């Protein structure tokens, strides 16, 4: 793959997450009954950062959990019978809560749909919203993000790579040609 452009550097990633944090607070008229669920792998550290920014703004902790959508993906053809079903790593209650699913990139919307399915299998929240760092278009399902860091229209021959300090050692969003 050939690097085409650096779309967001560390400062831009942080500014974007701070803005999304403010939008979440404003849209929900505060943070009562909010739960942030990050989609593994990069959605979870993003959820933790947004929770940290919200705490800095509101002075209150927001519960954070993760959702593993592996068993809910419709593009996997074979799943081992020995595989442990562990879709939500919460340690918290989601019934009647306002859930915000957080992911790094929204592309076809299949990951978001799988996360919604995983959440609904556990319990019925009051509502579900979606926050993404990057929306690159190419939706295959009628799902849209409620909070978008940056809209990046791409071709099918381009790849968006999100790097996060917690996983990759740096914060950046880059676009590559395949």
Swiss-Prot record:
How is the quaternary structure described? Homodimer and homohexamer; in equilibrium.
For this protein, the record's InterPro entries field holds:
PRibTrfase_dom, PRTase-like, PyrR, PyrR_bifunctional
Q: Does the keyword Lipid biosynthesis apply?
A: no
According to its UniProt entry, the function of this protein is described as: Regulates transcriptional attenuation of the pyrimidine nucleotide (pyr) operon by binding in a uridine-dependent manner to specific sites on pyr mRNA. This disrupts an antiterminator hairpin in the RNA and favors formation of a downstream transcription terminator, leading to a reduced expression of downstream genes.
Q: Which family does it belong to?
A: Belongs to the purine/pyrimidine phosphoribosyltransferase family. PyrR subfamily.
What protein is this chain from? Bifunctional protein PyrR
Q: What is the lineage of its organism?
A: Bacteria, Bacillati, Bacillota, Clostridia, Eubacteriales
Q: From the record, which residues define motif PRPP-binding?
A: 99-111
Q: What is its EC number?
A: 2.4.2.9
GO-annotated molecular function: RNA binding; uracil phosphoribosyltransferase activity
Q: SUPFAM superfamilies in the record, alphabetically?
A: PRTase-like
Q: Which organism is it from?
A: Clostridium beijerinckii (strain ATCC 51743 / NCIMB 8052)
The highest taxon in the source lineage is Bacteria
Q: Which gene encodes it?
A: pyrR
Catalyzed reactions per annotation = UMP + diphosphate = 5-phospho-alpha-D-ribose 1-diphosphate + uracil
- What are the recorded Gene Ontology BP terms? DNA-templated transcription termination
């Amino acid at each position: 793959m050939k690097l085409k452009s650096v779309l967001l550097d560390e400062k831009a990633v942080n500014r974007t997450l701070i803005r999304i944090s403010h939008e979440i607070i404003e849209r929900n008229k505060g943070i009562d009954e909010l739960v942030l669920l990050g989609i593994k792998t990069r959605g979870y550290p993003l959820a933790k950062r947004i929770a940290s920014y919200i705490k800095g703004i509101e002075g209150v902790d927001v519960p954070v959990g993760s959702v593993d959508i592996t068993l809910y993906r419709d593009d996997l053809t074979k799943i081992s019978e020995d595989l442990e079903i562990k879709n939500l790593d919460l340690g918290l209650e989601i019934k009647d809560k306002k859930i915000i699913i957080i992911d790094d990139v929204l592309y076809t919307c299949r990951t978001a749909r799988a996360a919604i399915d995983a959440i609904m299998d556990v319990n019925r929240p009051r509502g579900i919203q979606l926050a993404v760092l990057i929306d690159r278009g190419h939706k295959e399902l009628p799902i849209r993000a409620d909070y978008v860091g940056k809209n990046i229209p791409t071709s099918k021959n381009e790849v968006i790579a999100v790097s996060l300090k917690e996983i990759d050692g740096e914060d950046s969003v880059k676009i590559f040609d395949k």
